[in-house]
Regions:
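Bacterial N-terminal signal peptides
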Residues: 25-39
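A short, well-structured edge-of-sheet supersecondary motif
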Residues: 99-124
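Residue-level preference for non-acidic, small/hydrophobic
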Residues: 118, 137-144, 208, 240, ...
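Small-residue-rich helix-loop
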Residues: 121-123, 185, 382, 392-544
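Short active-site loop at a secondary-structure junction
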Residues: 123-143, 147
Length: 544
């Protein structure tokens, strides 16, 4: 057996941080079972704080070189920086950027350590629990990979009251039962339908009953974080989540015909489009305000998406995402549309009903979704909130059986898992596992410990591969694209109105991989990106 790594030494307490203002809207984009072998957990060497202050920090390439001599530039940078931050190992350009952004030192938290080292290169406010925003997805996805395994797949099943008759007709209801697949999109629903058609089903003479009992009811009883119910990032979890419960409208101007074409995905059986957009030749302007549709149910049971107003040819093609309808209505429309697309028929339009699959029902088809490794990649690359919440709830359902999945059961599962890893986190507060929360908390130090543990685990490569690559893809595709550090960072981002966070790994130019965690909780957090960029480039240059 390999020698166990050194155990943790907690960082020296620094200036106490205070959690500042209440958080408001998340502005992140939407997007997308082999259990691990047993054995002793690898406990990596957790780092101590630096013994003494870093005396200087190199200027980053993200800023144009000053004409003044380097010594004068460094002196000016240090003069603009908070000396307490610099004495804690935080590079002077980072501290100076915080000051320029109007972010007090107490509102920031940093922890940087080279993998395998026992001493941190930078540690500031590291024990203070902070709101991590979407970097909390690292806890959920690492737990998912370890507890469920990278090859875990969600199942969705179709049952019927009876086998299809000789003519392919099902006389009775059909039942669609979900187990929380985070990515049950049209392509996946089509596979389920194809299996049912291959089993001989051609016509359904009954209702469509949705069995969503795998998840508890009322998971979104507290509402959205900001009241923006039509924003895709606010979609709540459901055992039969279909296509993220979001309609994606594509607006395409055609100057040749002086029209604006509108298409939509996914196709819903009850959805109708009324396109009255007028193509103009002016400047694009605020196209979303002028071209956003109203989506309203009609007396005949259809749902009408109405477009009106002007749309400039200067805007080009755009996609507009709108979360709408209930989960049940959305999934009903998606199944009916896919059934008809595959050549299936209905003796009459099936009514939408909810309920459990009855005993004695006949299994028509079962579909296994994408493997967890692929799901984790979508969650972390694109910071998909509802997919993270689906995974978080699945942890409770799979590892703490005995009833519908709930956030409480999932929280207990994750806490027990952390304890088995030797990761005691007294300041950890879990809410929904996605970071789209005003309540969730974790310290930079604890996040760094988690990342060190992940790097030493068998699923470490899968987790790291799921992270956005600095300047290349995901939520980091536009960050430091021309800097020397581009392509060398693998980091999860976190964004709320008053939060900016980064957590992950940076490969230094001289060799070695570093764990990097930074969290800023302040009303001016959005102005502090320069501090994060300077930190990443400092680590890339060797963190010295």
């Amino acid at each position: 057996m390999a020698a166990m790594p050194k155990t943790l030494a907690a960082p020296t307490a620094t200036r106490p941080g205070t959690l500042l203002r209440r958080l408001s809207p998340l502005l992140s984009p939407l997007l997308a079972a082999v259990l691990l072998a047993g054995g002793p957990a690898l406990t990596p060497a957790y780092a101590k704080p630096p013994a003494k202050a870093v005396k200087s920090a190199k200027a980053t390439k993200a800023t144009k070189p000053a004409k003044a001599p380097k010594a004068a530039t460094k002196a000016a940078t240090k003069a603009a920086a908070d000396p307490a931050l610099v004495s804690a190992g935080v590079p002077a350009p980072v501290a100076a950027a915080l000051r320029r952004a109007g972010v007090p030192a107490a509102a920031a938290s940093f922890y940087v350590v080279r993998l395998g080292d026992s001493t941190a290169r930078a540690s500031w406010n590291a024990q203070q629990p902070m709101n991590p925003a979407s970097t909390m997805k690292l806890v959920t996805t690492f737990a998912g990979l370890q507890l469920l395994g990278p090859d875990y797949r969600w199942q969705t099943s179709l049952y019927a009251d009876a086998q299809p008759g000789f003519d392919g007709t099902i006389n009775g209801n059909v039942y669609l039962r979900g187990h929380g697949d985070p990515k049950l999109v049209p392509e996946e629903m089509a596979k389920l339908v194809a299996r049912a058609r291959a089993a001989g089903a051609t016509t359904i003479n009954g209702d469509l009953v949705l069995d969503r009992s795998y998840f508890a009811e009322g998971l979104d009883s507290n509402g959205t974080i900001d009241g923006e119910v039509q924003r895709a990032y606010n979609v709540g979890p459901d055992a039969l989540l279909y296509a993220f419960k979001t309609l994606s409208f594509t607006l395409t101007p055609d100057p040749a015909t002086q029209t604006v074409a509108v298409s939509v995905t996914p196709e819903l059986a009850q959805l109708k489009l009324d396109n009255r957009l007028t193509l103009t030749n002016g400047r694009c302007g605020d196209w979303q305000s002028s071209a956003s549709p109203t989506v309203l149910p009609q007396a005949d049971g259809t749902v009408l998406a109405s477009f009106s107003g002007d749309y400039s040819s200067d805007c080009g093609e755009h996609v507009l995402n709108i979360a709408t309808l209930s989960h049940a209505e959305f999934t009903w429309g998606g199944f009916v549309a896919e059934w008809q697309r595959a050549g299936g028929r209905f003796a009459r339009l099936p009514a939408l009903r909810s309920g459990k699959v009855p005993r004695g029902a006949v299994l028509l088809a079962r579909h296994y979704g994408l493997p967890l490794a692929d799901i984790v990649r979508d969650i972390n690359k694109f910071s998909n909130n509802v997919m993270a919440r689906q995974l978080f709830l699945t942890l409770g359902a799979e590892m703490d059986r005995g009833g519908p999945a709930s956030t409480g059961r999932s929280i207990r599962v994750v806490q027990r898992w952390l304890a088995r890893q030797g990761l005691d986190m007294p300041g950890l507060v879990l809410d929904n596992g996605s970071g789209l929360s005003r309540a969730e908390r974790i310290s930079a130090y604890d996040m760094a410990r988690l990342l060190q543990q992940a790097a030493a685990s068998p699923v470490g490569p899968v987790l790291i591969d799921s992270l956005p690559v600095l300047g290349v893809d995901g939520t980091l595709r536009n960050r430091l694209t021309r800097a020397s550090a581009a392509g060398s960072g693998y980091l999860k981002t976190g964004t709320l109105a008053d939060v900016r966070a980064l957590a992950g790994y940076v490969d230094a130019a001289e060799g070695g991989r570093y764990v990097v965690v930074s969290m800023i909780n302040h009303a001016n957090a959005a102005q502090a990106q320069e501090a994060h960029d300077a930190l990443l480039q400092w680590v890339y240059r060797g963190a010295h």
